[in-house]
Amino acid sequence: MGVETSSAWQALQLHSDSGMGSIHLSKLFQDTNRQDDYSLELSDVYVDFSKNRITQETVQLLIELAEQQKLPKEIHRLMTGEHVNDTEDRPALHTALRALGKDVSGGAETVQPEIEQVLQKMELMTKKIRSGHWRGYSGKPITDVVNIGVGGSDLGPLMITHSLQTISSPINLHFISSIDGTQTSNLLRGLKQETTLFILASKSFTTIDTLSNAETAKDWLKECISDERVIFSQHFIGVSTKPDKMQEWGIPPENQLMFWDWVGGRYSLWSAIGFPIALKIGMDGFRELLQGAHEMDQHFATADLKKNIPVILALIDIWNINFLNIHDKAILPYDARLRYLPAYLEQLVMESNGKSVARSGESVPYKTCPVLWGEVGPNAQHAFYQLLHQGTQAVMCDFIAPVERDDFDANSHTERDESLRHQHELALANCFAQSRVLMLGDNAIPSDLKASFDSPFKHYPGNQPSNTILIKTISAKTLGMLVAMYEHKTYVESVIWEINPFDQWGVELGKLIAKETYNAIKDKPLADSFDSSTKGLIDRVVK
């Protein structure tokens, strides 16, 4: 029997059916202390979850569900390196990557020497490249580094480096991920072979998307370099769990950075996959990123469930999804530097929890992962906020914003800095206003304007739940805390739903069939198993 038949689940269902499922947020906000009672803070991260259809009774019932599912035990199992990835019989030790040798035990402690060894090699390579001592075939220093990867080998480093774009760096960073070659072709036209270095990042070192782009990059280098040994020794670095495959492709051991099978791709930015981050902000900055994540890890491992930020955020989403029937979630950062955060979280959340089979092997009869999407908030206001405010879909939202900006002098009164300060305040005002209108609907309309909204086409139902997450500023530390918070939130949800968040079998079949389809496109006989649609599409391509 699954969690849906348990006493804690049934109690929540009864709670929803008895009125909480239909109560309007405007009624809950008649309590003037509500915001204080439904917010949590850890260091530079503040979470306001008051704009959810919950009461103290709801929270208590959710905590009882977590305790019934043995959440404290499962947190301990994750943090100490037990095999929580049961379908692949592995631990998920991404938290060990950012422990920096402290506050760990069990399997997480055992792997610390290996982790530190890789960090030291990363530091040496980072210093060599950033200082201009890593040189290309002509003797000129490397000026441009291109990360070739996809999924976890791309999204994490891309998101973090874009978020920290205001930090100056001696290296120009670029990212290639798409298999179609357009990114590669467009980028290479603007680079010079003699000053370009490629990072080839792939956990398995068999990912066709990555290897096809790498082959194109190698062919581009061959236009100027006749000696392949020079290409691989001076213009390629490999990051993988497979040193033999890296060497087979041509990358020498001294240019290899290792990580391990117990690091999931979507949890790998803390490993050598984060090498581009170190190139952008230096190893001190990279360790600050790890430290921020570790601070959230310690909070997650030790805080009481009711005061535990990832736990509370996860349980609220469980409430919204399974008891209020809300199956969409929007991530809305109010700073353009966080542009890639929604895409990063799409992979983290949906590849982890987009499952319909429990750990037992049985199909689950309840909803699991929501469809997650998002955009930079100010841009989204002019795109899909119409749906959020007046559509037929119920949508949960996470509003995310920095309280302060660090890309101008806060004490300066130059016209430029005053303008930037004004823009930042406008962004925050829009962030807070949008969450308020989503919550209150028509009740947010000022009394002196109500007459002008007296039309069915100007009706705002409100009652859309949201969280507002404020970080002090966008820094390596706060990004580490923010990403770790979402990682742990995702894990908590998987524990409640009794699914494994650390495998991704759903992506394998498509890759397998793509190989068969590629052979057909290359003018080989069509497989009898092809359907008429696929046959017709191939025919249109190969004619």
UniProtKB/Swiss-Prot annotation:
Pfam families cross-referenced by the UniProt entry: PGI
MF GO annotations: carbohydrate derivative binding; glucose-6-phosphate isomerase activity; monosaccharide binding
Pathway involvement of the protein, from the record: Carbohydrate biosynthesis; gluconeogenesis; Carbohydrate degradation; glycolysis; D-glyceraldehyde 3-phosphate and glycerone phosphate from D-glucose: step 2/4
GO cellular component, one term: cytosol
Catalytic activity: alpha-D-glucose 6-phosphate = beta-D-fructose 6-phosphate
Active-site residues, as the UniProt record annotates them: E351 (proton donor), H382, K511
Family: Belongs to the GPI family.
Xref: NCBIfam families: PRK00179.1
Protein name in UniProt: Glucose-6-phosphate isomerase
Encoding gene per record: pgi
